[in-house]
Structure formats: C-alpha cells, structure tokens
Amino acid sequence: LVPGKDFMISPHSSGLKGTFNVVKVDLNNWSSILKNSKVNHPLIVSLNVSKIIDRDTISIYKELRNILNKSFPVLWISTEKLQWSVADYVSNFPMIKIASKSVNYDFSRVQLNIEHKFKKGLKTQNVVGMVSGRRKKSIIISAHYDHLGMMGQVKFPGANDNASGVSLLLNLASYYSE
C-alpha cells in the first residue's frame, strides 16, 4: 500500500511494530472483543464501513472506532477521502485509515512498522492583519501559512492551499480597504 494514497496513519497514533492477527469488528461482536482487551496477544481490530451509506450508522461506527482505539490498534476501512491532520496528543495505539478501493478485505494478518515522533510544544507563526473600516463594523478574514508535516517519507506541504488562501486574503483586504 502507498502511504498518503492508500492509507493514512492518524496523527495521534503511537508507534507499533510487528505482525498482528486481524479481528473484524461490527455492531454485533464489538463488546465481546472489548471484554477480551486485557488478553495479551497481538491483535488489531478492523472496521469496514465502505458499504455503509447511512450517516447515522457511520457516526455510530466512528464512536465505536474511538472506543476500541483506547484498547486496540484499529484499521478503519472506508470510502472517505484520506486527509492528513495534526494532533496535540498521542494515543496508546495507532489508528490506520485505509481507502477501501486499495484493499481486499479478506486478510487475517497485517504487518506494521510505525515509527512516531511527537514534537510537544512546537511553535509556529501565522499572520493576522486588519483594515480599519469607515463604520463600526468588522469583517475578519483569515488564512493560515503553516503546513501539516510528514507521515514517513510522505510530506504534506501547505504551500498550495495556503498560498491560494493567503492570496485570496490579500485580494479581499485590498478590495475592502478601498
């Protein structure tokens, strides 16, 4: 699988290395799996929501995913667009989001080699500007300048969307200042 295209490791994930049995979880068996979470054996839970259309059901599965991720590494297989983000904490187990088109769901074991480096207290800068209006009304327009880091060797630069956002911001500021 190709990082950033076929799968994304959630930014709050901890590192993990090894080969693990995969247990498929659904709304019928999750509680029995959670009860056995104290058993010391290599295990990853997998939730496949790629065929679920109902938003409420997907929301329930997302809650279940978050509950299970407190006790297990989680594979989340869905049709959702893979998006990178940032986190301000590290969980005990990784969560791997997998594009459903990239994987055959008939696997029973998975091999992982996840390294994680969390930079606590990282400082960044953004720019804020203000144009005084003629009346006592305010319009606040903002854009960010930073980017979202890396996952392994895959970089998530912010230059494209940030440059267009900052450009729009400057054009709006120019327009409203006239």
Where are these regions (language model features)?
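Mature extracellular/periplasmic domains of secretome proteins
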Residues: 33-40, 61-70
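Loop/turn elements at helix/coil->beta-strand transitions in domains of secreted/extracellular proteins
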Residues: 40-43, 70-73, 135-139
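Internal hydrophobic scaffold segments of catalytic domains
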Residues: 1, 68-83
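Short, aromatic/basic amphipathic alpha-helical patches
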Residues: 57-67, 85-94
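Noncatalytic luminal/extracellular "stalk/propeptide" segments of secretory-pathway proteins
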Residues: 1-56
